[in-house]
Every structure is written in structure tokens, then in C-alpha cells.
């Protein structure tokens, strides 16, 4: 089974989540997949998503859907801000708090991630959910507090991450869009960043290390990559052909791309698009700048292309050019597959949708995660990286025409599509492997504290 093709179940956009009965013993499921004779024998798996962006919710959501409900009792914990987009949940949902996305992005522009106070509250919330559900295994995506809470609860923990955050990755750290690049320009700040980056990363490691020490756990050191990838097992939602690593330990493995698209009816214009011009799929996702989509649409307005755009519910467009067709959300995999080029924020969710279809990408990258991903795509020859600071329409238009007119971009994207499509160990097997290594009588150390 390949996790590289995980699809959303059929649902209506905006559908309500399935009601669930949450009990501490969690022995009998209230979801339709439950069978009375199977519940006691099924392994209980808890997925925990950090809902600062949609990508970190839909990845564990898609992985949770890949598990056989006759073998696993699945629980899904996340802030409910994206629940309407997910539609009816086929497993139990547990609401936990995630800081507002705007605060998270504001932190990133100031060169920091989470405050110690935030992580302490996260750990407390995690422990309540872990105690309530008593899972056999927990799977987290960017919920770095699980580095503490899962260990205190004695529960095996699988961390989902991108390979460019691996301590074993072969990459450099580019300068992201931060407040200083907007004030002083990229060139000057880049020189200082090369000197100060190790110190900045060390400062960003301090909050989690403080919380770990407070609970009697050892420090993870001053490598930010260890903060984002710490787990009993770490799975990279990437392929080595795009993001190579070296000397991976046995508990770090490639999972392959995890794809997701919102289910539901496409917009009315979906089946009547013009066919005489190349299609450009534009979406800045939930972590792109609110005004960037308008800039992109304006940049493409005079080009001989048809634009299909998804606002992700975040953009208040003042004008929609005549060659553009816009919706809040689109089926991303299908939109990418019918396009000549995809313009996005450079995040892994949309770039993987494009590359799986063999379509090159233009990434308008802002934060470090997006820059790391797009540098890998650009290095592979399958796309172009644009910076968000002082972005001009002419630069966007030039990049689009460059990618459309030069066949080497599509050829490179096709090579990556082949890599993404190769068979590899599927997520259910990784779950089985983690459970097999689980001690029979794991200690619940935090209960005594």
C-alpha cells in the first residue's frame, strides 16, 4: 500500500463533524465503523495535529483515514478551526487548543516559534487527552509538545515531519521573510543571518528544552531540527530524490508524500474552462500572505493563460481578472493535474500535489519551512522560488512564462513524479512496526507527578 496516494473520503464542503461520545475507557466506538466484537481487540491510535496551518491538520487526517477501522480504533485531536473543511469525521474528534494562526505567523516574522508558556499549556492539554483516551500509539504533526507529553505518559510517539527539517538532511538554511528583511532588505540581512543563525536557532530551542527539563527530561540540544523531528519514530513526508539525507538512524524513515484534497462538488465553471490556453493553478494556501493572491492574479491578467485560483477562505479580492476563475477551495490534486504550472506559497502540501502530477511549481515563499521546501524543488529543476518581500507583478509574470516556455521544468517535475510514485513501506506498516516494539507494560510516569 502506498501512502503517496491518500485521498479524502467523499464529503460535503462545510459538513458538520460526526458527533462522538468521549469516554476515558474508549472501549466502544460511536462511529459507524465500530463492531462490538472488534472494539476490545483493536489497537487505539491517537493522531494529534497542530492547526496553525491546514497542512499540519490534513496530513495526520489523511494518514488516520488510511488505517483499517476493523483493526484500529482511531482518535483525532486538533483545534476545530478546520473541521468544516474536513467534513464529517469518520473517527472521534477531541478538541485541543492551538494558538491562533496569525500569532504563529507573527512569531515567525520575528524569528521565533513557541513561547515556553504556550508549550507548558500544550503539554498539560496533551496529557489530559492522553489520559482520557489511553492510546497504544500517538502520531503527531508539528505538535512538538508531544516530545514531552508522550514520554511522560509512556506512550510510543511517531513524529511526522518534512525531510528538510531532518538533522541528517543535506541542505543549507535560507533566509526567510522576517521583519528585518522588510526593513533593511534581503542582501544586508542575509550577511548577518549567516553569522547569527546558529544563535537564533539555539534561542528557538530554549522553550521546549526548558519545558523538558521541568519535567525531568533531557535537553534536545541546540539544533532546531531535533526539536521538529524528535520522536520514538520519525517519518518524513518526502522522498530522498527531492530531499536527500545521510546516515539516517533506523527509527527515521521516508514515508513519501501525503496528499489531501477537500471533497465535494467543484465550482460551476470547473467543466467549462477554456482549452485554448495553458492553465495556471494559483493558491497561496492558509499560510500565504492575504494580499499575495491579488498580486498574482493581477500579474497573470495580461498573459495568454487561464487562471484557476483558490483563496483558502483568506483573501478578500478586490478585482478578478477576466482570465481568472476563483473559488474558496478547489480539489488540489485535480487542479494541479490539469495545469501547466502551479503558483503557491511553496509549502509541501501544494508542491507535492503538483509534483505527483509532474507539474512544475512557482513558490512564493515566506517562512523558513516554505523556503526550505522550495529550495529543494528549485535545486531539482522543477520550479522557481520567489520571495514575498517587495514582490512585483512583473517578477511573477516572468517566472510563469519562463516555466511554461521551457520544457526542462516539466521534465524535472516528471522525474520527481516517478520518484513519488514508487512503492515504499506504507503508513499502516509503520504503525504496526511501532506497536511491535512497544513494551507490554509501559509506565504511566506522569500519573505519579
Curated annotation (Swiss-Prot):
Q: What class of enzyme is it?
A: transferase
Q: What is its EC number?
A: 2.4.1.-
Q: Which GO terms describe its biological process?
A: glycolipid biosynthetic process
Q: Which residues are listed as membrane-spanning? A: none
Q: Summarize the protein's role.
A: Catalyzes the transfer of the first rhamnosyl residue on p-hydroxybenzoic acid or phenolphthiocerol derivatives to form, after O-methylation at position 2 of the sugar unit, mono-O-methyl-glycosyl-p-hydroxybenzoic acid derivative (p-HBAD I) and 2-O-methyl-rhamnosyl-phenolphthiocerol dimycocerosate (also called mycoside B) during p-hydroxybenzoic acid derivatives (p-HBAD) and glycosylated phenolphthiocerol dimycocerosates (PGL) biosynthesis.
Family to which this protein belongs: Belongs to the glycosyltransferase 28 family.
* Protein name listed in UniProt: PGL/p-HBAD biosynthesis rhamnosyltransferase
Q: Name the source organism.
A: Mycobacterium tuberculosis (strain ATCC 25618 / H37Rv)
Amino acid at each position: 500500500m502506498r501512502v503517496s496516494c491518500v485521498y479524502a473520503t467523499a464529503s460535503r464542503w462545510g459538513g458538520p463533524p460526526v458527533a462522538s461520545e468521549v469516554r476515558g475507557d474508549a472501549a466502544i466506538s460511536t462511529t459507524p465503523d465500530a463492531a462490538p466484537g472488534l472494539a476490545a481487540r483493536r489497537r487505539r491510535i491517537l493522531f494529534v495535529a497542530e492547526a496553525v496551518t491546514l497542512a499540519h491538520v490534513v496530513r495526520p487526517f489523511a494518514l488516520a483515514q488510511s488505517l483499517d477501522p476493523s483493526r484500529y480504533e482511531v482518535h483525532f485531536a486538533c483545534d476545530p478551526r478546520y473541521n468544516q473543511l474536513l467534513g464529517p469525521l469518520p473517527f472521534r474528534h477531541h478538541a485541543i487548543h492551538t494558538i491562533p494562526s496569525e500569532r504563529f505567523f507573527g512569531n515567525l516574522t520575528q524569528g521565533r516559534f513557541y513561547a515556553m508558556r504556550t508549550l507548558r499549556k500544550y503539554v498539560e492539554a496533551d496529557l489530559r487527552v492522553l489520559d482520557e483516551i489511553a492510546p497504544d500509539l500517538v502520531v503527531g504533526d508539528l505538535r512538538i509538545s508531544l516530545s514531552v507529553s508522550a514520554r511522560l505518559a509512556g506512550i510510543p510517539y511517531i513524529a511526522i515531519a518534512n525531510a528538510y527539517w531532518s538533522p541528517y538532511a543535506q541542505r543549507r538554511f535560507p533566509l526567510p521573510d522576517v521583519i528585518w528583511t522588510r526593513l533593511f532588505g534581503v542582501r544586508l540581512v542575509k550577511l548577518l543571518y549567516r553569522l547569527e543563525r546558529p544563535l537564533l536557532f539555539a534561542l528557538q530551542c530554549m522553550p521546549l528544552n526548558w519545558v523538558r527539563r521541568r519535567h525531568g527530561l533531557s535537553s534536545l540540544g541546540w539544533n532546531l531540527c531535533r526539536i521538529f523531528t524528535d520522536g520514538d519514530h520519525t517519518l518524513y513526508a518526502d522522498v530522498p530524490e527531492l530531499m536527500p539525507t545521510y546516515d539516517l538512524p533506523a527509527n527515521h524513515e521516508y514515508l513519501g508524500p501525503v496528499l489531501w484534497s477537500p471533497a465535494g462538488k467543484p465550482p460551476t465553471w470547473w467543466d467549462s474552462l477554456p482549452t485554448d490556453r495553458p492553465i495556471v493553478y494559483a493558491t497561496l494556501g492558509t499560510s500565504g500572505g492575504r494580499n499575495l493572491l491579488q498580486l498574482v492574479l493581477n500579474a497573470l491578467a495580461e498573459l495568454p493563460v487561464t487562471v484557476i485560483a483558490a483563496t483558502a477562505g483568506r483573501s478578500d479580492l478586490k478585482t478578478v481578472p477576466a482570465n481568472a476563475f476563483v473559488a474558496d477551495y478547489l480539489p488540489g490534486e485535480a487542479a494541479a493535474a490539469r495545469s501547466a504550472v502551479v503558483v503557491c506559497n511553496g509549502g509541501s502540501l501544494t508542491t507535492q500535489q503538483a509534483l505527483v502530477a509532474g507539474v512544475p511549481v512557482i513558490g512564493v515563499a515566506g517562512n523558513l519551512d516554505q523556503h526550505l521546501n522550495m529550495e529543494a524543488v528549485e535545486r531539482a529543476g522543477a520550479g522557481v522560488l520567489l520571495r514575498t518581500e517587495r514582490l512585483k507583478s512583473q517578477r511573477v509574470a516572468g517566472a510563469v512564462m519562463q516555466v511554461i516556455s521551457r520544457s526542462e521544468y516539466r521534465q524535472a517535475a516528471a522525474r520527481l513524479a516517478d520518484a513519488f510514485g514508487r512503492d515504499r513501506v506504507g503508513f499502516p506498516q509503520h504503525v504496526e512496526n511501532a506497536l511491535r516494539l512497544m513494551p507490554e507494560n509501559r509506565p504511566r510516569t506522569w500519573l505519579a507527578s
